[in-house]
Structure formats: structure tokens, C-alpha cells
Amino acid sequence: VWEGTLTDGSIDPLEGENGISWSSTGSGWFGAGIMSMQPINLFNFSEGHLNFSIKIPANVSFQIGIIDSWGNQSYVDFPSNQTTYGLVRNGNWGQASIPVEEIRGDYIDLRMLSYQFVILEVNGASCEFGLDDIYWSGGGEVLKISNSNSILDRFLLNDNYPNPFNPLTTINYNIPGDGFVNTTIY
């Protein structure tokens, strides 16, 4: 929640026992987002959708967006009383599905997302709303799953790519048996 613009609400989740419910505090705007502790790579979802369910008064305009680790922000508009991205604005629970190519904008780095979901209202509307079922879909297909339990007969050094944004990298390798290993990195 940004700058104390929202407090806990009382709207029950759409389904199950968990959801998000907030009430605006009358600050003239409100904003909040779902932020990961480390940047998330959602590049495989570039042709997918950001989906969510929301219960919000029909007369409240809002924006849904994403923010990358570089501070780039991009939003799509949900005008009051208009069906947008499949969300029917009647004050009841409804679902929206935003194509990632539309919410991404020109500068969002999907490989380094800090906020995977942001809601923002800037017209000063006071309201209570609920969010549920926030997820990204269409991230590609698994091409092949191999469940081979074969025993290694040779050393294997897997591809290792350092993260240029972090001084640490993980180096994965396999050896044919148990034992002490001395690894030197140049």
C-alpha cells in the first residue's frame, strides 16, 4: 500500500478463504502493488495475459500496471461504467484479462519485474474494493520432460550465465560419483 492510501476492507474473497480487500482513506488517490523481494523474470509471458478478479464500484476509474526494476511503469485504464478487457463494470465481482503486450508498454523489462501487479486510482474516488485470482497466463509450453534416472559416467558442466545485475552466480555441474571436489574459477 502506497503512502497510507488504503486500509483493510471487509469484502469477502471471490472464492476460497484468501483475497485482498481494501478501503481508500480519502487521500485523493490510492495505490498498491504486489512486489517480489527479488525481480521476477516473466519474459516467457510476453505473449500471455495478466488476469485478475475485482469487485469495485462501477463509477470508480482505475489503472492496472506493472513496474520493472529500472523504475519503468506502464498502466492500462479501466474507465468507470465501461467494459474493458472483459471486466463488466456493474459493481459485482468480474474478471479482466489484459494482454501483456498492451500492459508492457515500450520500456518495461519483463526479465526484471519488481511489481507484477499494481492498482492505481488518481481521481479522488473513495471506495472499498476486493481483488482475487491475480495470475499471469500463457507463459509458453513445456516442450519435453525427461525423467531419466541414468547414472553419470562423465563430468558435466552445465551452462552458466552470470547475472550482470548481481555479483553472485550459481555454477551447476554433475560428477559421476560422491567425493570431494575442488573447483577453480578463473
For the regions a protein language model found, what residue spans apply to each?
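Beta-rich carbohydrate-recognition modules and glycan-binding surfaces
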Residues: 1-144
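Beta-strand signatures of extracellular beta-sandwich domains
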Residues: 63-65, 182-186
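Glycine-centered coil/turn sites that cap beta-strands in beta-rich domains
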Residues: 146-161, 165-184
